[in-house]
């Protein structure tokens, strides 16, 4: 069925992205931390679409893929910067403050630009395009919030870097 096929595709993407994180960061804990914010935004937005009874068509189903794709970039940038800065300071709290003032600002600015870019699609007269713009913009906003709040919180909680 279509639902089963879509589920298999998402499982494959999750495994692939997790594998990419493991190869990139060479750290299982850090990889698990890194994928959480990405999937939360995608699952949340698909949940809202389902609750509203909006059918999953080509426009709405690609929202999750786009969300994960962009959120993964944000997570990689944040984790990479955190790792680099932590190697110098060896202090999680100082590193968090530094990362939020540098890469955090960049993630915020690019994410807001992306949200506005997708939001312009609400001016369309084609309903699937309107849905795509609204929900992708909302998903990007949620992904940004997740990467800037949940990701650092998980890093502080789990402390995946060696002192």
Question: Language-model segments: which ranges?
Answer:
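Loop-to-transmembrane-helix entry motif
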Residues: 7, 39, 99-110, 135, ...
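Hydrophobic transmembrane alpha-helices
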Residues: 18-21, 39, 55-79, 116-119, ...
């Amino acid at each position: 069925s279509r639902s089963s096929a879509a589920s298999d595709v998402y499982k494959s993407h999750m495994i692939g992205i997790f594998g990419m994180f493991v190869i990139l960061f060479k750290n299982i804990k850090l990889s698990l931390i890194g994928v959480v914010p990405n999937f939360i935004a995608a699952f949340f937005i698909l949940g809202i679409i389902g609750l509203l009874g909006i059918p999953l068509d080509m426009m709405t189903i690609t929202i999750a893929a786009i969300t994960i794709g962009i959120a993964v970039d944000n997570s990689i940038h944040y984790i990479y910067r955190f790792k680099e800065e932590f190697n110098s300071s060896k202090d999680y709290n100082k590193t968090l403050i530094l990362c939020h003032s540098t890469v955090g600002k960049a993630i915020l600015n690019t994410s807001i630009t992306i949200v506005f870019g997708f939001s312009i699609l609400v001016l369309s007269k084609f309903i699937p395009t309107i849905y795509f713009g609204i929900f992708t913009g909302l998903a990007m906003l949620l992904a940004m919030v997740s990467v800037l709040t949940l990701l650092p919180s998980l890093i502080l909680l789990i402390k995946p870097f060696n002192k």
